[in-house]
């Protein structure tokens, strides 16, 4: 079977698997956050931490909880790295330096997993298991929790009548009451106040009911495929050529599962998913791609269930799918364009790819990992053709909404939907409404700042790095490609992706500090802004739909939504792209 046929087959299987799981997995996540009962282990956690799980939080309280948990996570992971030499299973590694420890702590807390170090030669098993792997779970859970809180903001109904009374929405004769048509289906789940839920409950449920069960199964599947899972240290073995090689073992499969499923991306080994201990075969490669896309492509179904209109979720996921498939097609085309002597001879640009996967499956993995916030790699992105690499860069510049990271993809797409409805409202001269909520100046300010925050961080960081002579010395390439590498690094950090072009010596005090700040603000600023927007929507009374209301579930709206996403990227990043990968491609 040729690699092209294998690539087409892999895409077909992947699309089929995602479509089959879209409904059941999306419905399952809906039931997780709709459930009134708490599991016994959850109640124990709430008692231990002093959390009242039945108390709702308005958006400022929810946001403060996110900030507090995130900053404590950074501190604990930083301290764990700094005392590594005193920990068991440290494999003889000493304490991680202050700048690198800061960068790594922020990286894993923000779900970025940017790695300025080689995992097998820097981190011992204790730090890997109790620090990095734990953050892989909770950072993904934070993103999902924020997404669910944002959806609640759109779905909330403020009702002045007494809840539970005869005429109230949950009373005996009310629409959500036991005898009403809604019979406990929606108001019981969403509520009628302006609270966005309880962050600690959302976080706990996400980890225990969603991430842990799937990752246990996924780890077993990966072990069956050849991924390793042990507590071995470094072993020196004799090679066939008569030399010696050091092989590092460790709890790889368990970390690989959450690395992909939580769209984290940080590898146990320096070469990430190109290492045969992490990603042994072509079918485990497909399993890993499925894992990193599963949550992001199923959350729109959860969204549709929560807002009471499943068609809204279908419209969102359709835009995600079209953008994702288009990106893969363009990237694969650029990688097989046959420009140059070697690509013509072998049929594709194979530098930096693994022969186990070939160009199509490498391009598929690269597209999936940059369209989400994963950042894992099974090929060397810096070796892609200039326009192939530009496609990966463009994927991150989209804000990773096609489908995006765990949670961040959904709430990013919802902010895009708000902007799209606002633009459409301006064109027809009506007050814009989305899901029964009016979009006023307050909401559009939050949305505008959301789309300005990440590009500003990425472009400012790139500009400063290019302007400092000392930091330019860290670049191993000059010209357009050198600019592309720096732009890629800060775009990856600001968008919490974590993949890299390489070509830069980033384990320096300046780069560790600057990229750490880019990751921190790139994660927390958009979260705070989108929670503020959700809180503003939650305070509103729903507006009944009229003949002039824009239908947001139809193909016309989906087309506008995709166009707005592309236009925002083009207007924001085109000058930088023109100076970097586009200039290199034309040359």
Swiss-Prot record:
InterPro entries: KdpA. Keywords: Cell membrane, Ion transport, Membrane, Potassium, Potassium transport, Transmembrane, Transmembrane helix, Transport. The keyword Disulfide bond does not apply. The keyword Transmembrane applies. It is found in: Cell membrane. One of its GO terms (molecular function) is potassium ion binding. Residues 164-183 have a biased composition (Gly residues). Residues 162-188 are annotated as: Disordered. One of its GO terms (cellular component) is plasma membrane. The chain crosses the membrane at residues 1-21, 60-80, 89-109, 131-151, 208-228, 280-300, 314-334, 409-429, 449-469, 514-534, 557-577. Belongs to the KdpA family. The system is composed of three essential subunits: KdpA, KdpB and KdpC. Part of the high-affinity ATP-driven potassium transport (or Kdp) system, which catalyzes the hydrolysis of ATP coupled with the electrogenic transport of potassium into the cytoplasm. This subunit binds the extracellular potassium ions and delivers the ions to the membrane domain of KdpB through an intramembrane tunnel. This is Potassium-transporting ATPase potassium-binding subunit.
């Amino acid at each position: 079977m040729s690699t092209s046929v294998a690539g087409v087959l892999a895409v077909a299987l992947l699309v089929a698997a995602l479509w089959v799981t879209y409904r059941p997995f999306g419905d399952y996540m809906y039931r997780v956050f709709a459930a009134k009962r708490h599991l016994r282990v959850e109640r124990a956690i709430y008692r231990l931490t002093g959390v009242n799980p039945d108390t709702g939080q308005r958006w400022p309280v929810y946001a403060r909880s996110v900030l507090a948990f995130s900053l404590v996570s950074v501190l604990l992971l930083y301290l764990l790295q700094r005392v590594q030499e005193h920990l068991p299973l440290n494999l003889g590694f000493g304490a991680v330096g202050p700048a690198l420890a800061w960068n790594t702590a922020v990286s894993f807390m923000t779900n970025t997993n940017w790695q300025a170090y080689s995992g097998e030669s820097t981190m011992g098993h204790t730090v890997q298991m109790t620090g990095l792997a734990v953050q892989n779970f909770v950072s993904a859970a934070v993103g999902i929790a924020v997404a669910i809180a944002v959806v609640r903001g759109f779905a909330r109904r403020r009702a002045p009548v007494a809840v539970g009374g005869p005429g109230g929405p949950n009373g005996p004769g009310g629409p959500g009451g036991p005898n009403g048509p809604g019979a406990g289906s929606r108001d019981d789940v969403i509520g009628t106040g302006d609270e966005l839920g309880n962050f600690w409950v959302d976080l706990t449920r996400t980890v225990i009911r969603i991430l842990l069960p799937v990752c246990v199964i996924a780890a077993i599947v990966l072990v069956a495929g050849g991924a390793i899972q042990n507590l071995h240290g470094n072993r020196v073995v004799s090679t066939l050529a008569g030399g010696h090689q050091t092989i590092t073992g460790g709890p790889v499969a368990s970390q690989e599962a959450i690395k992909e499923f939580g769209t984290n991306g940080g590898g146990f080994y320096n070469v990430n998913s190109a290492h045969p201990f992490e990603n042994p075969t072509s079918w485990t490669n497909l399993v890993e791609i499925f894992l990193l896309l599963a949550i992001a492509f199923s959350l729109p179904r959860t969204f549709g269930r929560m807002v009471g209109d499943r068609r809204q979720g279908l419209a969102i996921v359709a835009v995600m799918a079209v953008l994702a498939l288009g990106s893969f097609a363009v990237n694969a085309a650029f990688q097989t364009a046959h420009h140059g002597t070697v690509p013509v001879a072998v049929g594709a640009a194979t530098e930096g790819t693994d022969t186990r996967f070939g160009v199509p499956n490498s391009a598929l993995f690269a597209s999936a990992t940059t369209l989400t916030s994963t950042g894992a790699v099974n090929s060397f992105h810096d070796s892609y053709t200039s326009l192939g690499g530009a496609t990966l860069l463009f994927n991150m510049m989209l804000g990773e909404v096609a489908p995006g990271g765990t949670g961040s993809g959904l709430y990013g797409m919802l902010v895009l939907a708000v902007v799209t409805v606002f633009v459409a409202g301006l064109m027809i001269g009506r007050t814009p409404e989305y899901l029964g909520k009016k979009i006023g100046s307050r909401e559009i300010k939050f949305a505008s700042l959301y789309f300005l925050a990440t590009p500003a961080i990425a472009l400012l960081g790139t500009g400063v790095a290019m302007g400092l002579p000392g930091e330019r010395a860290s670049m191993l390439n000059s010209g357009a490609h050198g600019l592309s590498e720096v732009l890629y690094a800060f775009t990856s950090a600001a968008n919490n992706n974590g993949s890299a072009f390489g070509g830069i010596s980033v384990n320096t005090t300046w780069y560790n500090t600057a990229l750490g700040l880019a990751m921190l603000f790139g994660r927390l600023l958009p979260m705070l802004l989108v929670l503020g927007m959700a809180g503003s929507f939650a305070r509103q009374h729903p507006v009944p739909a009229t003949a002039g209301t824009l239908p947001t579930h139809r193909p016309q709206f989906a087309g506008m939504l995709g166009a707005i996403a592309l236009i925002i990227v083009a207007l924001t990043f085109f000058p930088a792209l023109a100076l970097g990968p586009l200039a290199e491609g034309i040359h």
